[in-house]
Structures are given as structure tokens and as C-alpha cells.
Swiss-Prot record:
Protein name, per record: Outer membrane protein F
Membrane topology value: Multi-pass membrane protein
Transmembrane segments: 22-27, 29-44, 56-68, 71-83, 98-107, 111-116, 152-158, 167-178, 191-201, 204-216, 231-242, 244-255, 281-293, 296-309, 323-334, 337-346, 365-374
An example Gene Ontology biological process: monoatomic ion transmembrane transport
Species in which this protein is naturally found: Serratia marcescens
Subcellular compartments: Cell outer membrane
Length: 374
């Protein structure tokens, strides 16, 4: 019974923090440095050869802070991912820096940081991105404007509205242009800004909304189906997190922002090619329901869909589903550091002319993992 009670307290905190129990490396004279990470022994089972096989990875990072004055604190974070499913001869293939930023926190006046960080749209998207393995992929991609992890973002955050309203948080974000390092057109962005706000009204209930708008680069306008000057997105969401129950839902729309399909981003790709582009508009919906048993089991069922509008792929129609699946999974926590999970992605996309033309996968995937985290 004691173990069950401990797990009931530890696991929700683990899920909220993203790390089970960061190892404190140094804590002296107002300076603190923590190490966190995980090793995920992960395997996919699928008829799709591109998604079948070993997916093991290692992820670790540092969080540090320094007390400058009683009102001013400096902080920084760095996170790195190492793929462990490649031959040694392939070297560092798949390794990447996920996060890297530094900032200052000014007591109740908020915090400001700059670097590689999450875009403010993820403040709401993160509520539904809680599946054991899959999820968070209707419109959120790394280095896709301010939808996920991205470069060159200056972020101001304020919690509890200057200390005046408990649970009312907001963020303002600016992103500089990213196109000068030879990156793929799908990963480029012009100057942009975003705003988000979340409100925890108590009893486990929270609401949130976010908006972002960016200039598109010349390459994005010339080498894709959509040639609009701006890329925009907005999202709203809600969650309930109490009494061992977790429920969350999100709706979002994007314009000239969400990439789909393969690498041939041209406005003349034929239906027989692995073509793709930016969707003129997408409508995105995600919902997840989970329950945490005291003995460590956490079952989950979720539904995710992204519908693209005015896709301009010749011969296949202008409106198509880009993402559509049901996730059924469960995680079992042995303790705060060790867990195992299985996640079954039931792909509801049809194998049709559109998915063949764009190379979008339509097969189911089962992910099975064993995780050590600290």
C-alpha cells in the first residue's frame, strides 16, 4: 500500500516535470546545476518499412540557475538527443540539440530568455501531447515556425499575472528569420511573433489559447503551392488533471504554415511523384483521456486528426486528411525512474491517390518501450 501511495504522488509530478528526479550536480552559494535524462529502448512494429524496427534513443540535458540578487535569477537549459539505432559507422546520424537557451527571471515581473526553445503555440499543444509514444503531430513539428522546438526565439513569460491572479499565465514571443544555414524550405521561417495565455481556474481545470504569425521566406513562397506572405496559426485548448484522471482537448487552425508530403516542394508536382507543399489551411483536433492507477498503470486512449484545405495536388482533390489516427496505449511505472509502455497507433488514413502521391504513411504502428529516466 505504501508503494501505491508513493506512486500516486510521484507519477503526476513526473509527467508534469518531464523528468523523474533530476540529479543535482552542484548547489552552493546560490548556484545550482541539475542533470536529467532518459534512455528509451524503443521498437516499432509496422508493415511500413520506414517505420519498422529499432528506434532506441538517449536524451539528456542540464538545467542551471544562479541567484544574482534576492529579486533577480539567471538560468539556462540545454538538451540533447542521441539516436542509438544506427551502426557505429554512421557516426552522429540523428543526434541533435533539442533545447539551448539562457535567461533572467525578475521575481513577480516575469522571465526573459533567448535561444532554441519551444514556440508559444506549444503552450496549449503540450496538454494533448501526453501519449506514451505518439501524439502531438497534427500540426506541431520541430523547426516549423513557432509550433514546436525552434531556433532564435526571444520569450517573455509571466506566471500568476505579476503575482496578482493565481493561475493566470501569459507569454510573448519573437522569432528572428532562420534561412541562412542551408536548411530545408520546410524548416525556414521569416520574422514572427506569438502570444499565449493559460488560466488554471482550480479543481484541476485549465483553459488556454495561443496565436502566432510569421513572414514566410522567399523560398517558401516560390517553391511551394502556397505563395502567401504570412504563415499564421491559432489554437485553443482545455484540460482536466485531478483525481487520477487526465483529460485534454485541443483545436487549432493554420494557414500557409503546415508542411505535408515529400521533398519536391514545387507548384507543378505530378500525382505520381513524392510531392508536397504547405497547406493553404489546416483544421486540427486532438483529444486524450488517461487514468492513473495507484499501483502504477496508466492506460490511455486518444484521437488526432488534421485536415488540409486547398492542397493543390493535381488529380487528387484539394481537401484531404493529413493525419488521422486513434492511439490506444498504456504505461506502467515500476517506480519514479523505471517504466515500460506500449502504444498502438491505429492509422485511419486511406491508401489512396493522395497518400501515394505525397508519400504519407497509412499503416498502423505499435511502439513498445522500456525507459530508465532520472
Amino acid at each position: 500500500m505504501m508503494k501505491r501511495n508513493i506512486l500516486a504522488v510521484v507519477i503526476p509530478a513526473l509527467l508534469a516535470a518531464g523528468a523523474a528526479n533530476a540529479a543535482e550536480i552542484y548547489n552552493k552559494d546560490g548556484n545550482k546545476l541539475d542533470l536529467y535524462g532518459k534512455v528509451d529502448g524503443l521498437h516499432y512494429f509496422s508493415k511500413d518499412k520506414g517505420n519498422d524496427g529499432d528506434q532506441t534513443y538517449v536524451r539528456f540535458g542540464f538545467k542551471g540557475e544562479t541567484q544574482i540578487t534576492d529579486q533577480l535569477t539567471g538560468y539556462g537549459q540545454w538538451e540533447y538527443n542521441v539516436q542509438s539505432n544506427h551502426a557505429e559507422s554512421q557516426g552522429t546520424e540523428g543526434t541533435k540539440t533539442r533545447l539551448g537557451f539562457a535567461g533572467l527571471k525578475f521575481a513577480d515581473y516575469g522571465s526573459f530568455d533567448y535561444g532554441r526553445n519551444y514556440g508559444v503555440l506549444y503552450d496549449v499543444e503540450g496538454w494533448t501531447d501526453m501519449l506514451p509514444e505518439f501524439g502531438g503531430d497534427t500540426y506541431t513539428y520541430s523547426d516549423n515556425f513557432m509550433t514546436g522546438r525552434t531556433n532564435g526565439v526571444a520569450t517573455y513569460r509571466n506566471n500568476n499575472f505579476f503575482g496578482l491572479v493565481d493561475g493566470l499565465n501569459f507569454a510573448l514571443q519573437y522569432q528572428g528569420k532562420n534561412q541562412n544555414d542551408g536548411r530545408d524550405v520546410k524548416k525556414q521561417n521569416g520574422d514572427g511573433w506569438g502570444i499565449s495565455s493559460t488560466y488554471d481556474i482550480g479543481e484541476g481545470v485549465s483553459f488556454g489559447a495561443a496565436y502566432a504569425s510569421s513572414n514566410r521566406t522567399d523560398d517558401q513562397k516560390l517553391r511551394s503551392n502556397e505563395r502567401g506572405d504570412k504563415a499564421d496559426a491559432w489554437t485553443v485548448g482545455a484540460k482536466y488533471d485531478a483525481n487520477n484522471v487526465y483529460l485534454a482537448a485541443m483545436y487549432a487552425e493554420t494557414r500557409n504554415m503546415t508542411p505535408f508530403g515529400g521533398g519536391n516542394f514545387t507548384n507543378t508536382c505530378a500525382a505520381t511523384e513524392n510531392c508536397g507543399g504547405f497547406a493553404s489551411k489546416t483544421q486540427n483536433f486532438e483529444v486524450t483521456a488517461q487514468y492513473q492507477f495507484d499501483f502504477g498503470l496508466r492506460p490511455e486512449v486518444s484521437y488526432l486528426q488534421s485536415k488540409g484545405k486547398n492542397l493543390n495536388v493535381p488529380g487528387v482533390g484539394s481537401d484531404q486528411d493529413l493525419v488521422k489516427y486513434v492511439s490506444v496505449g498504456t504505461t506502467y511505472y515500476f517506480n519514479k525512474n523505471m517504466s515500460t509502455y506500449v502504444d498502438y497507433k491505429i492509422n485511419l488514413l486511406d491508401d489512396n491517390d493522395f497518400t501515394k502521391a505525397t508519400g504519407i504513411a497509412t499503416d498502423d504502428i505499435v511502439g513498445v518501450g522500456l525507459v530508465y529516466q532520472f
